[in-house]
């Protein structure tokens, strides 16, 4: 049991696969760790409901936050609504190992407040085109791990994974990234290994 839960922030544009990754992480880690999730949506609790429907965790371990307005404000400038959800989960489940905080769909400039997230994963998807990594922004350049998702779509949208890799290396330097396809679990083991290593997670 860890004294304070590791808080992992998952950000990225709308439709990049954040909720699918959150679901995959919950399914892979829930037997080994004491986990809870906070999701952010602007006007609904759709992502939270998706996770409940797909039985990611018990419903009481998932809190859906309705941010209203601009989604990245709730994870950065005024993270109070998310910090309160994290506290609520800590009270509800003493001894949590891991809390995943999934942001609402945001733009490339969104980042997590250090108060809210210990580690940040930023998810982009190949269907947005192979020029996306070179556009930069804090999510692409500064996240702890960049997840380039939906690699299976590359041939359909004419995107080059080689170009994406080259530009990602240029934009991120030695910061890690992983190619992923959550439909078949590609990249998931690497993402989990990164979270465990960097977050110093140890199973009970």
Swiss-Prot record:
Domain of life: Bacteria
GO cellular component labels: cytoplasm
Family annotation (InterPro entries): CobW/HypB/UreG_nucleotide-bd, P-loop_NTPase, UreG
Keyword field contains GTP-binding: yes
Main location: cytoplasm
Gene3D superfamilies: P-loop containing nucleotide triphosphate hydrolases (3.40.50.300)
GO molecular function, one term: GTPase activity
Subcellular location: Cytoplasm
Entry keywords, A to Z: Chaperone, Cytoplasm, GTP-binding, Nickel insertion, Nucleotide-binding
Record-stated family: Belongs to the SIMIBI class G3E GTPase family. UreG subfamily.
Name of the molecule in the record: Urease accessory protein UreG
Organism: Ectopseudomonas mendocina (strain ymp)
């Amino acid at each position: 049991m860890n004294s304070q839960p590791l808080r992992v922030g998952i950000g990225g544009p709308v439709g990049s696969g954040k909720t699918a990754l959150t679901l995959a992480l919950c399914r892979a880690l829930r037997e080994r760790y004491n986990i809870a999730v906070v999701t952010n949506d602007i006007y609904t609790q759709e992502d939270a409901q998706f996770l409940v429907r797909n039985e990611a965790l018990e419903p009481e371990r998932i809190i859906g936050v309705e941010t209203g307005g601009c989604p990245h404000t709730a994870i950065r400038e005024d993270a109070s609504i998310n910090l309160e959800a994290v506290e609520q989960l800590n009270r509800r489940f003493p001894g949590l190992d891991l809390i995943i905080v999934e942001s609402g769909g945001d733009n490339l400039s969104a980042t997590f407040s250090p108060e809210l997230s210990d580690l940040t994963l930023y998810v982009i998807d190949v269907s947005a085109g192979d020029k996306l990594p070179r556009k930069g922004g804090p999510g692409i350049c500064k996240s702890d791990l960049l997840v380039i998702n939906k690699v299976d779509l590359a041939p359909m949208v004419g995107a080059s994974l080689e170009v994406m890799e080259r530009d990602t290396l240029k934009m991120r330097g030695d910061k890690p990234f992983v190619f992923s396809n959550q439909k078949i679990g590609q990249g998931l083991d690497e993402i989990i290994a990164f979270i465990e290593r960097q977050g110093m997670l140890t199973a009970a």
